Amino acid sequence: MREIVHVQVGQCGNQIGAKFWEVISHEHGVDTNGTYFGNKDNQIEKIDVYYNEVSGNRFVPRAVLVDLEPGTMDSVRASNYGRLFRPDNFVFGQSGAGNNWAKGHYTEGAELIESAMDIIRKESEQCECLQGFQIAHSLGGGTGSGMGTLLISKIREEYPDRMMCTYSVVPSPKVSDTVVEPYNCTLSIHQLVENADEVFCIDNEALYDICFRTLKLVTPSYGDLNHLVSAVMSGITCSLRFPGQLNADLRKLAVNLVPFPRLHFFMVGFAPLGSRGSQQYRSMTVNDLTQQMFDSKNMMAACDPKNGRYLTAAAYFRGKISTKEVDDQMIEIQNKQSEHFVEWIPHNIKSSVCDIPPKGMKMSAAFIGNSTSIQELFKRVGEQFQAMFRRKAFLHWYTGEGMDEMEFTEAESNMQDLVSEYQQYQDAKMDNDAFEDQDLY
């Protein structure tokens, strides 16, 4: 089987991760003790991708939980699904990273890294044919960003040919809980550009917008936000976990979505999004899903795809849907919105259909877009970074842990390069002149 080892780092990563396991356990018919209670063969057919079967017919997630302070771990352990995880797979320190990337990457995190890697090795050795790793973390804090990127580079060193995919919660323009987010985020992106294969960018502000605007929630909690993220994670991984007509795996996804190695930062979306009670009052068609999926209001990163162009995109449908219908919709959306797709990659939407819909729905779709408008996100962080770095504000916290100003400058210029690469491909046109000159002779 094509197994995936899941690693969740820091407070944000552990909360998103816990929700993800709750959602997919539900889909696979695994209860809070890891016992299978489902009644469909397809639930169990590819369950090995994410679960390990142990004695007594129990299923244990291939998950490694890492944090530099015990708080979040304790609440995961005390939650409904806390008994699901293998107790040895909780790796935690006592000191915390205090929102400091340098602590997570160089000092506190480095002390814990070996014990985390040991468990990751153990999990990987139990796989028949390891497909890759997925990391859930945030880029604004200290542990998820600093130690998360350290783990990614260590895993990369040991497993260079396996896929590395991350669900990264990026700092949002209006919702900020840490003053030093721009530093932590820039230093992390510097790492992710080099060491990750696929980065799904999620940001809290876009999630809040969806909660207010679409789900009509008055006071959304982090629980509601995590629910949205887990819906996307479940949708993206659906065709890895269930038999379907058009399957996809992490590598196929990367091959279809990454036209140039550094440009692997994706926007994600999910459809149908409706307020909790209104689901049963509407019938969805593939057309509705497609419209909603490509709508900027459904994007979980605060970037508007209309300001850029899609290099590539992927649509993962779930439910009893004919592949023909999906193909027709994809062609139609490309024709209708042709100015939002680059013309030098024809047929740039990959689609996949998985027969099993999420619980309580007839059909759903997850969307992944590689759009040049993601540069807005990097630009925003870059501007905030510059404003503080010019005055060397808060820098002593980082240099005190042994960091060098050079590292900041490097990370900043790497991010600026990334922005200009996206811009360059956004402006690139089909080169017709090359052919026209030949007529002269």
Swiss-Prot record:
GO biological process assignments: microtubule-based process
InterPro entries: Beta-tubulin_BS, Beta_tubulin, Tub_FtsZ_C, Tubulin, Tubulin/FtsZ-like_C, Tubulin/FtsZ_2-layer-sand-dom, Tubulin/FtsZ_GTPase_sf, Tubulin_C
Gene3D superfamilies the record matches: Helix hairpin bin (1.10.287.600), Tubulin/FtsZ, C-terminal domain (3.30.1330.20), Tubulin/FtsZ, GTPase domain (3.40.50.1440)
Signal peptide bounds: none
Names of the cofactor(s): Mg(2+)
Residue ranges of the TM segments: none
Molecular function, one GO term: GTPase activity
Name of one Pfam family that matches: Tubulin
Keywords recorded for this protein, A-Z: GTP-binding, Magnesium, Metal-binding, Microtubule, Nucleotide-binding
A single GO cellular-component term on record: microtubule
Binding annotation for Mg(2+): 69
Binding site for GTP: 11, 69, 138, 142-144, 204, 226
Subunit structure, interactors included: Dimer of alpha and beta chains. A typical microtubule is a hollow water-filled tube with an outer diameter of 25 nm and an inner diameter of 15 nM. Alpha-beta heterodimers associate head-to-tail to form protofilaments running lengthwise along the microtubule wall with the beta-tubulin subunit facing the microtubule plus end conferring a structural polarity. Microtubules usually have 13 protofilaments but different protofilament numbers can be found in some organisms and specialized cells.
Main function: Tubulin is the major constituent of microtubules, a cylinder consisting of laterally associated linear protofilaments composed of alpha- and beta-tubulin heterodimers. Microtubules grow by the addition of GTP-tubulin dimers to the microtubule end, where a stabilizing cap forms. Below the cap, tubulin dimers are in GDP-bound state, owing to GTPase activity of alpha-tubulin.
Family: Belongs to the tubulin family.
The protein's name in its UniProt record: Tubulin beta chain, nucleomorph
Organism the protein comes from: Guillardia theta
Lineage: Eukaryota, Cryptophyceae, Pyrenomonadales, Geminigeraceae, Guillardia
